[in-house]
Amino acid sequence: MSYDRAITVFSPDGHLFQVEYAQEAVKKGSTAVGVRGKDIVVLGVEKKSVAKLQDERTVRKICALDDNVCMAFAGLTADARIVINRARVECQSHRLTVEDPVTVEYITRYIASLKQRYTQSNGRRPFGISALIVGFDFDGTPRLYQTDPSGTYHAWKANAIGRGAKSVREFLEKNYTDDAIETDDLTIKLVIKALLEVVQSGGKNIELAVMRRDQPLKILNPEEIEKYVAEIEKEKEENEKKKQKKAS
């Protein structure tokens, strides 16, 4: 029997191959990074080069789900569109029903449950996306969650998904400290530094979104990103000079 054809059939050694193939699709997607700061959450995504005549505003990997929640994804864009639309409807339905916005965990659990249903149903296939979901709960607490095609979800301080996830996660494990997220600017710089581990040609290939407590989602423009990249480069040069002085 071909165990990789049927979604709902386990192989003898306990694998659901279609779910694993969906996870492989995520690994081929653009790298996305999320970091939870003290009063800010930041999402950064590697921008693929677009065709010369294409409007790059239509190629977005970061989107708002509600006033207090947004997400970035890696994987199949068409699959992500379905998940995003369903999540937005759920956010609106929740607001109409209980007259409060969703918590970040609530909408993450909804997205994870939707993905899980598609791993257990005939005539469907798993969603080929992983998502980083960030936002603020009504008490002002910043949150960061990650979901994968199998329907599992976890809370994180910082995480990465997509093709460069392994090296970016290693960078974050070494560099994520309380001092590194002391201010909003430092948190933004940490995300950019993490992305520069895998992104070529600096800030022009980075898409960045920030959300501060009680403020709407803000997508940074290329000039703002370049300013941060220039500051990071300057800091690197100064650190190199200090090292050389110590060595001599």
From Swiss-Prot:
* Residues annotated with N6-acetyllysine modification: K227
Q: Which InterPro entries match?
A: Ntn_hydrolases_N, Proteasome_alpha, Proteasome_alpha-type, Proteasome_asu_N, Proteasome_sua/b
Which tissues does the record link to its expression?
Answer: Detected in liver (at protein level).
State the compartments where it is located: Cytoplasm; Nucleus
Q: Which UniProt keywords apply?
A: Acetylation, Cytoplasm, Glycoprotein, Nucleus, Phosphoprotein, Proteasome
Q: How is it modified after translation?
A: Phosphorylation by ABL1 or ABL2 leads to an inhibition of proteasomal activity and cell cycle transition blocks.
**Residue(s) carrying Phosphotyrosine:** Y153
The main place the protein resides is cytoplasm
Q: What induces it?
A: Up-regulated in liver tumor tissues.
Q: Which SMART domains did the record assign?
A: Proteasome_A_N (SM00948)
Any one GO cellular component localisation term in the record: cytosol
Record's PANTHER family? Answer: PROTEASOME SUBUNIT ALPHA/BETA
Quaternary organization: The 26S proteasome consists of a 20S proteasome core and two 19S regulatory subunits. The 20S proteasome core is a barrel-shaped complex made of 28 subunits that are arranged in four stacked rings. The two outer rings are each formed by seven alpha subunits, and the two inner rings are formed by seven beta subunits. The proteolytic activity is exerted by three beta-subunits PSMB5, PSMB6 and PSMB7. PSMA7 interacts directly with the PSMG1-PSMG2 heterodimer which promotes 20S proteasome assembly. Interacts with HIF1A. Interacts with RAB7A. Interacts with PRKN. Interacts with ABL1 and ABL2.
Function of the molecule:
Component of the 20S core proteasome complex involved in the proteolytic degradation of most intracellular proteins. This complex plays numerous essential roles within the cell by associating with different regulatory particles. Associated with two 19S regulatory particles, forms the 26S proteasome and thus participates in the ATP-dependent degradation of ubiquitinated proteins.
Q: What is this protein called?
A: Proteasome subunit alpha type-7
Organism listed in the record: Mus musculus (Mouse)
Mind giving the lineage of the organism this protein is from? Eukaryota, Metazoa, Chordata, Craniata, Vertebrata
Q: What gene does this protein come from?
A: Psma7
